Amino acid sequence: MSETLSVAVTDPIVQVKNLAFYYGASKALHNISQDFPRNKVTALIGPSGCGKSTLLRCLNRMNDLVDGARVEGSILLDGTEVNTPAMDVIELRRRVGMVFQKSNPFPKSIYENVIYGLRIAGVRDKAVLDQAVEQSLRSAALWDEVKDRLHESALGMSGGQMQRLCIARAIAVNPEVVLMDEPCSALDPKSTARVEELISELREKYTIIIVTHNMQQAARVSDYTAFLFEGVLVEYGVTEDLFVKPRNKQTEDYITGRFG
């Protein structure tokens, strides 16, 4: 197995070291080592089944929910090991939020969707909750569209609005990292453009790690890009460099459409 072509990252917030992941006896990730820089957007690209979503879900231990899952290696969040019994998984998922491929608002009001995580954390002060709702919806570029119907069902929103609501819900608990798993795959081009603009704005406050099949999207929104193939991190670098002058032939073949 060839060595990963990788770039040095300054001020990493997440550090992955020799990470291997198994679904039962099947090895899905092979000794991944990768640093994710703070307040940047990192895209994970590669063909279906390459392990990019598995890697993403390792970062906040969503894979704990999978029967037979097993992790080896280390994941550090600001220097603290994630894969240890001492780690409070609920607190980890507050610090490392998740936006899924399919928008998944709860069958509750828009307001209740945004404050869901805060309620779990024990926040009851209405003034604090009201402020969090407005700030999060403004950050998600949604406030002006929904401010007059906060107590209506979130299920009446458009697909693009629902996905931005899910982003608002993720950032309402003030995470350090936001994971996004194909957040635009079910959206029309106009809604996709809104979410991409939002990702660019959110990098000022949060570290964003996004899985995408859309290489043009990766090129547009990310600062760094990692290419995975068959569970191996093949190449990782500054996005412009990786797309314009990839150092690995396999990377070049993928981004030029020779396979995928």
UniProtKB/Swiss-Prot annotation:
InterPro entries: AAA+_ATPase, ABC_transporter-like_ATP-bd, ABC_transporter-like_CS, P-loop_NTPase, PstB-like
Keyword Transcription (UniProt): no
GO cellular component terms, semicolon-separated: plasma membrane
One protein family per Pfam: ABC_tran
Keyword Translocase: yes
This enzyme's EC code(s): 7.3.2.1
Residues in ABC transporter domain copies: 14-255
GO biological process terms held by the UniProt record: phosphate ion transmembrane transport
Annotated localization: Cell inner membrane
Function description: Part of the ABC transporter complex PstSACB involved in phosphate import. Responsible for energy coupling to the transport system.
Name of the protein this chain belongs to: Phosphate import ATP-binding protein PstB
Species name: Syntrophotalea carbinolica (strain DSM 2380 / NBRC 103641 / GraBd1) (Pelobacter carbinolicus)
